[in-house]
Amino acid sequence: MIGLPLLLAACASTVPDLYTAPNAGFAAVSDQTSVAIGKRTAFAQTQAENEAIQREVRALVQGKTISADTAVQVALLNNKGLQASYADIGLSAATAWQEATPVNPVVSIGVLGIGAAELGAYRAIEGMIASNLLAAQTRQQRMALADVNFRAAQARAVDDTLALANQTRAAWINAVAAFETVSYLQRAKVTSDAGAELAQRLGETGALNKAGQAREFAFNAELAGQLAQARLNASRAKEELTRLMGLWGDDLSYFVPDALPAVPRNLRSVAGIEARALNNRVDLRVARLDLEAQAAAFGLTDRTRLVSDLELIAGIEAEREIEDGRKRTEASPQLELEFAIPIFDTGKARMRKAELSYLQAANVLAQKAVNIRSEARAAEAGYRATHRIAQHYRDVLVPLRATVEEEGLLSYNGMITSTFELISAARDRLGAELQAANAKRDFYLAEADLTAAIYGGGAGASASTATAALASAGDADH
C-alpha cells in the first residue's frame, strides 16, 4: 500500500515545452522553408493573426502587377490548404503530449450492507485504486514513437510548403506565357486581317481568283479561332494562379506581366545535383522517419506481445461488526494483479504485421533514394536542354525570320516582291517569335523543376504513412 503512491509518483514527469507550445514545431518548418526557397511562411491560429495576413496580402496584390516571387509569398501566407497542413503539426504534438502524460489511476469506492441500522447505515466500505502497469512500462517506447511521428509531421509540412511554392511558380509562368501568346497572336491577327482585306479588294478587281481569296480568308478565320482559344487559356491559367494564392473578392484585382523575362545567357551551377538532392530532399527525410517510426512500433509491439493489459489494484476494506454488544471496525488491505492470459492470442500475428510494416518502410526508403537520384538527373538534363533550345530560337531562328522579312520589305519597295509574299514573311516571323516564347516558358518551368528536384515538393514526392504507425502499434485584364 505504501509503494503505490511511490509508483505513481515515479510515472509522473514534465512534458517537454516542444509539445505544449501554441506553435509547437512550426519554427523548424519556417526555418527550413526559408533556407530552401527564401520565403516566409506563417501559421495563423487567431482572428488577429488572420487579419494581419489579409492586410499584408492585400498590400501585395491589389492593383499590382505581381512577380513570381510575390505570387509564391502570397500563396505561402494565404493558402488555407497549407494552413491545414500546419495544423497537422499541432495534432501530432498533442498526440506526443498525451503519450508523455501518465495514465490516470482509477479510483473505486463501494459500500456494502446498506440499511443495516444496528451498524450505522452500512456494513462495510471498500476503496480501490487501479493503476495500469503496462502503460507505465511502455511509456518511453510510446513517447519515442510519438516523437518520431511529430518530426515526420514537421517534414511533411515542409514538403507541402515546397510543393505549393513550386506549383505557384509554375502557375505564374504558365499564366504569363499564356498572355504572351495572346499578344503574339493579336499581332498575327492584325497582319492576317490586312491580308484578308487585300485579298477581298483584289478579288473585286479580278486580280485574284476565288481560290486565292478563300486561302487568305481561311487562314484569317483559323487565326481568329486560335486567338480566342489563347485568350481562354490565359484566363484559365490566371485562375489557377488565383486558386493557389487563395485569393477572392477585391483581391482579384491583380495583374501578371505581358511577357516572361529573357532567357539568361548563363545557367546557374548544378554541380553535384544528386548529392545535393539526397542531402536536402524533404520527402526522403519523411521516408527515413517512416522507417524509424516502424522500428519504434516494432519495439512497442514486441514489449506487449504476450501481455497486452496489466493492472495493479490496491485498496482497503473497512468492515463493521457487533461483538459483545459493541461495534467494531476492522480494516483489511487488498492487493490485486489483473492481466489477460495469452492462451489464444499469443501476439504472433501482431509481430508479423509489425515485421512486414518495417520491411515495407525499408523498401519504400530504398526506392525513394533511387527515384530522387533519377529525378535530379532528369531535372538537370531538362534544365540544360531547354536553355539550349530557348537560346536557339532566340539567337538563330527569330533573327533569320526577321532578316527574311526585312529583305522582303526592300524587295517590295523595289516592286520585286508581291504584297502577299511580304505578309507571309511577317507571319513566319511572328510564328518564330511564338515558338521562342514557348521555348522560354519551357525553360522557366524546367528551372522550377530543378529547385523541386533538389529540395522537394515536386511531382515525385509522395505522402507519408508515418502517422499510422502509432495506431498500428496500439491496435480579360490580366
Question: Where are the language model's segments positioned?
Answer:
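Membrane-embedded beta-strand positions in outer-membrane beta-barrel channels/transporters
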Residues: 72, 126-128, 172, 274, ...
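Alpha-helical heptad-repeat coiled-coil segments that mediate oligomerization/polymerization in large
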Residues: 206-209, 372, 379, 415-419
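Short segments within alpha-helical structural elements
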Residues: 222-250, 398-459
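Terminal intrinsically disordered/low-complexity segments used for targeting and assembly
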Residues: 1-74, 231-276, 451-478
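A glycine-/polar-enriched beta->alpha junction
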Residues: 77-84, 90-105, 118, 127-145, ...
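Small/polar, glycine/serine/threonine/aspartate-rich low-complexity segments that form flexible
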Residues: 54-64, 108-138, 142, 255-267, ...
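Periplasmic alpha-helical coiled-coil/stalk elements that build and connect Gram-negative outer-membrane
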Residues: 138-139, 148, 155-276, 379-382, ...
